[in-house]
Amino acid sequence: MLRKLQKYWKKSIIFQRFTWMIGIVFIYMLGRQIPIPTVGVDKVVVGNASDSQLLENFGAITGIQFSNMTLFSLGIGPTMTMMILWRFLITFKLIGSWTSNKVNRLQFLLTLAIALLQSFGITNDSKFLLIFGYSHSTLRIITIILLTTGTFILNWLCKINSERGIGGMTVVILVNMILTFQSNIIRYFSVQQFKFSSLIQYGLVFFVALSILIWFNILLYKGEYRIPIQRVGLNTPYHASSYLPIRVTPAGAMPFMYGMTLMMLPPYIFVVLLHIFPGNQILEYLSVHIGLSQLPGVICYIFLLYFLSIGFAYYNYDPYEISKNMRNNGDYISGKKPGEETIKYIQYVVNSFAQFGAFTVIIFGGLPMLAVLLQGQGKNSVSIALLISNAYIIVSLLLGVIEQVDTMNSWKKYKNLI
């Protein structure tokens, strides 16, 4: 049996990568259970239990933990925040033709700075165990170092998964989302204390609603607008079917993922600023009302989702770069002159679908939370409202992983020439 598995493991690339992925997920789950020795295992990291649960639901993308302090409490939040800042630097041409070593060095320093900032914020309200005669400040510094180290260990695991496994960083995000999705459902039904008959009814309604949501997400993910293109000097039976695909939702699930990550950053910044300017009423007001359990925070989140949807749409489909590549390859759009006219036409198409994608993202992510707050419901209801956007993210990421596996198996579709 073991020999058969060993032979199959050597022959199957998918099985090899799947094994690596499972191993890395196991290490990640193990790291989530390793406590930081300077903080009690039963201590809530920030505020009260309900606040920490809400923050964890919002930080499900990055895997951040507020209910207890573990090696991977920061998750991949610093890395994702760095990636957002890096994309802004590239978009605004603030980074030239740098060498790979210089790029890696700057990305490392940015990640380190963000990890230290988040570690400082997450340890602000922590209750440390006064052990070995160390002072409170010393224990906090040790905790910050351990949390930052855990972040870079997790980044290393994600890099290994990208090289040898399946999904790269996406797998870590998927694990976090599924765990949070499951815990939210269990917590909601346990708090409501439904009767058995009511539980079955609500369960069926939830299942039907979730099925419709998944179906609609798949429809949006696979939907695309095809711009017919002509290829100069190409005369084959397939040249007439050449096209430029533009997805119906050009930004995909990235506005949700990076929007949640960015919304986790202001609380840390306000913690640092309140240490520098204690008693500042403006900072105190912002630190309290910028959260998603408050109306100003939800409104900021909706605007952030909109701008991220437009930004990522143009990042994924840059009209200038697309037009430039088409001209270099001898391709053109029928009825459109290469150059400025082609750029304007592609920009018009991308902008149309970017606006539609932004509208869809706001409906899935912003409106449910806004409705819950306007009805005056509690923080648990906000967590339930986040389930809609979480389901959207999970489906999108799973479809991306499935596409990667299909690409690996694409060689099986071709017959041997010899």
Swiss-Prot record:
**Per the record, what is one GO cellular component?**
plasma membrane
Task: Name the source's superkingdom.
Answer: Bacteria
Q: Which terms are listed as keywords in the entry?
A: Cell membrane, Membrane, Protein transport, Translocation, Transmembrane, Transmembrane helix, Transport
Topology versus the membrane: Multi-pass membrane protein
Q: Which InterPro entries match?
A: SecY/SEC61-alpha (IPR002208), SecY2 (IPR014269), SecY_dom_sf (IPR023201)
Its assembly, as annotated, is: Component of the Sec protein translocase complex. Heterotrimer consisting of SecY, SecE and SecG subunits. The heterotrimers can form oligomers, although 1 heterotrimer is thought to be able to translocate proteins (Potential). Part of the accessory SecA2/SecY2 protein translocation apparatus required to export cell wall proteins.
Q: Mind telling me which PANTHER family this protein's record contains?
A: SECY/SEC61-ALPHA FAMILY MEMBER
Spell out the family assignment given in the record's similarity comment.
Belongs to the SecY/SEC61-alpha family. SecY2 subfamily.
Query: What is the name listed in the Swiss-Prot or TrEMBL entry for this protein?
Result: Accessory Sec system protein translocase subunit SecY2
Q: Which organism is it from?
A: Streptococcus parasanguinis
